């Protein structure tokens, strides 16, 4: 957050516009050299994200990497404008993330770069299903049940934005909750049936 003059992010360097959503203003030109990084976060309670606003030209040279991490607070299918400039040249060679189910994609126009997280593709088929990253039959059953929830449901959203490696443990935790809730419901139903008799 703040304002700087002409800026060049060199190989091994990183540009992060702010801590907990910030806007960095560049009064002049911004250059991302090969091997540099651009790190962005988003507000999980809204549509705001880190952003760089360049008054001159944003020159994105080959090799630059945009990193988006699960700790960044991004929502799936939400479009975030992360860079605006008087003019934009070049593109990021890669965009990386640590999400298990979501892959970031970038869109460019003459003056901006936007980011959207989309469901990763499964080999030979459509989207990666929640069950594709489950290890056991119980985890797969739980994953399939979660996938039937609306995309706006908090449990669905929590699973969809898990970091890599986390889904099996999350499904184990959820299956325990499901069994406990089912058991409680069955016990309540049995008690009510006994009262009727």
Description of each model-found segment:
Residues 70-197:
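Outer-membrane translocation/initiation segment of Type V secreted surface proteins
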């Amino acid at each position: 957050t703040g304002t700087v003059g002409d800026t060049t992010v060199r190989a091994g360097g990183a540009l992060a516009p702010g801590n907990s959503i910030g806007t960095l203003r560049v009064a002049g030109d911004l250059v991302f050299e090969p091997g540099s990084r651009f790190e962005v976060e988003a507000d999980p309670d809204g549509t705001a994200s880190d952003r760089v606003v360049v008054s001159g030209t944003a020159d994105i040279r080959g090799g630059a990497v945009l990193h988006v991490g699960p700790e960044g607070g991004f929502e799936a299918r939400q479009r975030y404008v992360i860079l605006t400039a008087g003019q934009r040249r070049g593109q990021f060679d890669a965009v990386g993330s640590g999400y298990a189910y979501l892959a970031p994609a970038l869109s460019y126009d003459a003056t901006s770069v936007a980011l959207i997280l989309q469901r990763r593709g499964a080999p030979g088929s459509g989207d990666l299903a929640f069950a594709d990253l489950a290890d056991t039959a119980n985890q797969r059953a739980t994953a399939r049940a979660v996938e039937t929830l609306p995309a706006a449901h908090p449990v669905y959203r929590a699973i969809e934005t898990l970091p890599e490696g986390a889904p099996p443990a999350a499904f184990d935790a959820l299956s325990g909750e499901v069994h406990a809730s089912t058991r409680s419901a069955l016990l309540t139903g049995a008690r009510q049936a006994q009262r009727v008799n």
